[in-house]
């Protein structure tokens, strides 16, 4: 079985919380744009996202007072390097996690962080995990800031400092489901967590031990999965997605997941920009 078969994502450009994948658009927008959608080839388009980002359609929508930006943000996957091995940006990552937070209503999506988060202002270092669990921590979902109880937490970090341009993406996942809670660090290159992450994990562990009897920290780093220079972003997102779909962290320490799997996963992550 392919590793991609263990998760619930698909190559559709529609956001994954939508149950009807025949169209990603709301019924109102479908009706208003029928003439464009039926003749999308004349616009040089082969997808709905292409149609609603076409200059002629955007101009028409503006005249009619239609909010196409909201459609793109809440009903489509994030734009990104879907069919190539382009490096993922923080926007690619955060916009994907925000969309997953619509599908997984108990998932707290934390904005990306650079590795100097202990001295630079990043949400990652300010989050109180007890407040996350109790629904007292603010997060961005469906275009608005909300509070809601969450039993999972995910964030993608870059191993570079904020003064740099970025080096390598890694993942943090906190699982507050079940009897034994876990604070997990995943690095597709197989490297151990650096000091700032170790300190963060221990601090969060002490927070959670105030409300739960068993909490452990895990470094999921015993296998070097990644061999390419481009797939650290997809690997980091894949780890979070697999854990949301209840794939055990043990799967990542028992067998290598290949770069070829991540090339395919890109088609599950993004719509064509």
Swiss-Prot record:
Active site, renumbered: 168, 187, 232 (nucleophile)
- Biological process terms in GO annotation: proteolysis; symbiont-mediated suppression of host innate immune response; viral protein processing
Q: Where in the cell is it found?
A: Host cytoplasm; Virion
Pfam families in UniProt = Peptidase_C48
Looking at the UniProt entry, the stretches that span the membrane are none
The family assignment reads: Belongs to the peptidase C63 family.
Protein name (database record): Cysteine protease S273R
- From what organism does this protein derive? African swine fever virus (strain Badajoz 1971 Vero-adapted) (Ba71V)
Lineage, uppermost ranks: Viruses, Varidnaviria, Bamfordvirae, Nucleocytoviricota, Pokkesviricetes
